[in-house]
Amino acid sequence: MSRGLDPEKKEELIEEFKINDKDTGSVEVQVALLSARIKHLTEHLKQHPKDYHSRRGLMMMVGKRRKMLKYLRKSKPLVYQEIINKLGIRG
């Protein structure tokens, strides 16, 4: 199993969620990338349930994504709903 996201998948996510052509760091893109990393790490932990170091990293990523989504919900509610639906995560 590889570490993190492969560059093609990352580029694909950036293309889908970017606001303009040069956008790579907007909240929308960051949430999408974090969600992909969280999904990848969740699959890893199903295979390796005693990998506590990775589990802690997962919890930190989930917390970071939660904070970003909270900010997005407050500042851009329509974009928040759209991202929640696209990524299939609870809001």
From Swiss-Prot:
Gene Ontology MF terms in the entry: rRNA binding; structural constituent of ribosome
Record's keyword annotation contains RNA-binding: yes
Protein's GO biological process: translation
GO annotations of cellular component type: cytosolic small ribosomal subunit
Family indicated by similarity: Belongs to the universal ribosomal protein uS15 family.
Protein keywords: Ribonucleoprotein, Ribosomal protein, RNA-binding, rRNA-binding
SUPFAM superfamilies: S15/NS1 RNA-binding domain
CDD domains registered for this protein in UniProt: Ribosomal_S15p_S13e
SMART domains, alphabetized: Ribosomal_S15
Pfam families: Ribosomal_S15
Gene: rpsO
Protein's UniProt name: Small ribosomal subunit protein uS15
Biological role stated in the UniProt entry: One of the primary rRNA binding proteins, it binds directly to 16S rRNA where it helps nucleate assembly of the platform of the 30S subunit by binding and bridging several RNA helices of the 16S rRNA. Forms an intersubunit bridge (bridge B4) with the 23S rRNA of the 50S subunit in the ribosome.
Quaternary structure and partners: Part of the 30S ribosomal subunit. Forms a bridge to the 50S subunit in the 70S ribosome, contacting the 23S rRNA.
